[in-house]
Amino acid sequence: MYGIEYTTILTILISIVLLNYILKSITSMMDFIIYRFLLVFVIVLPFIKAQNYGINLPITGSMDTAYVNSTQQESFMTSTLCLYYPNSVTTEITDPDWTHTLSQLFLTKGWPTNSVYFKSYADIASFSVNPQLYCDYNIVLVQYQNSLALDVSELADLILNEWLCNPMDVTLYYYQQTDEANKWISMGDSCTVKVCPLNMQTLGIGCTTTDVATFEEVANAEKLVITDVVDGVNHKINITLNTCTIQNCKKLGPRENVAIIQVGGSDIIDITADPTTIPQTERIMRINWKKWWQVFYTVVDYINQIVQVMSKRSRSLNSAAFYYRI
């Protein structure tokens, strides 16, 4: 009997010790699993973006989002305005503080003096190919000059729109334009551009590919040329390479925060786009030639009307181009 009791007690003690060992083993295993999971979580956490409610937008002088134009009720306290003008302005206006004077005048129209910037350019053709536009609203003054041999409508097309361009090797390759937004832009001291359309067998249509004299001339001795040909047709191109460069460009869309004011020649009478007589619905104006002070006074006086048809730092593909003439 005593042997049975001792055996029972011993069995119970062994069971208790074994159970205690099993529980400790399970506890240690759970601790190992939990700590390892926490370690992995801490390591991976910096690489996890749990809340990503937006996308990265490329900014090239404008945000690729259309903004509702609310300038009519805006005090412009948070907006910036850049006025671009030719270097010839400082030849006529000798006052070293002329920009300060204009800043004070813009202040009377609701533009703080630290929000208006004046920037000069030497060559409108070079400026138009790669304009550096820094402000919420950008106004470019273009002076009319017959001697420049420039088509102002082509300048406006370049400045008022964003372009993606790549160089062309017309000596080795044929080129075709894919759609209406695809243009060939030539620029230089003297650009003469000739083209020869090709059929499916790369034979000239109305021209001979080996005889430049048979090519169709689309531009002669111009400083800036935007060539538009029939889409989807290969072309052999001839250009005065020693005085001109050519690029294959794609129009991305309008810069809605940019306006052009063309300062016309003294022999031109045109009030069709004058902001002083016609309410503006586009971003293109004209002011017939006056002294530069009078031009700037006109711009200041009508600045808030001008920006009504612009969009602050916006580039909407559905909006019309904008060009003013003074």
Curated annotation (Swiss-Prot):
One of its GO terms (molecular function) is metal ion binding. Residues 165-167 are annotated as: CNP motif. Keywords: Calcium, Capsid protein, Disulfide bond, Glycoprotein, Host endoplasmic reticulum, Host-virus interaction, Metal-binding, Outer capsid protein, Signal, T=13 icosahedral capsid protein, Virion. It is found in: Virion; Host endoplasmic reticulum lumen. Ca(2+) 1 binds at residues 95, 206, 214, 216. Residues 253-255 are annotated as: GPR motif. It holds the Pfam family VP7. The keyword Lyase does not apply. Residues 1-50 form the signal peptide. N-glycosylated. The N-terminus is blocked possibly by pyroglutamic acid. Disulfide bonds join 82-135, 165-249, 191-244, 196-207. InterPro entries: VP7 (IPR001963), VP7_1 (IPR042207), VP7_2 (IPR042210). GO terms for cellular component: host cell endoplasmic reticulum lumen; T=13 icosahedral viral capsid; viral outer capsid. The keyword Nucleus does not apply. Ca(2+) 2 binds at residues 177, 228-229, 231, 301. Glycans are attached at residues 69, 238. Some rotavirus strains are neuraminidase-sensitive and require sialic acid to attach to the cell surface. Some rotavirus strains are integrin-dependent. Some rotavirus strains depend on ganglioside for their entry into the host cell. Hsp70 also seems to be involved in the entry of some strains. Calcium-binding protein that interacts with rotavirus cell receptors once the initial attachment by VP4 has been achieved. Rotavirus attachment and entry into the host cell probably involves multiple sequential contacts between the outer capsid proteins VP4 and VP7, and the cell receptors. Following entry into the host cell, low intracellular or intravesicular Ca(2+) concentration probably causes the calcium-stabilized VP7 trimers to dissociate from the virion. This step is probably necessary for the membrane-disrupting entry step and the release of VP4, which is locked onto the virion by VP7. Homotrimer; disulfide-linked. 2 Ca(2+) ions bound at each subunit interface in the trimer hold the trimer together. Interacts with the intermediate capsid protein VP6. Interacts with the outer capsid protein VP5*. Belongs to the rotavirus VP7 family. This is Outer capsid glycoprotein VP7. It comes from Rotavirus A (strain RVA/Human/Philippines/L26/1987/G12P1B[4]) (RV-A).
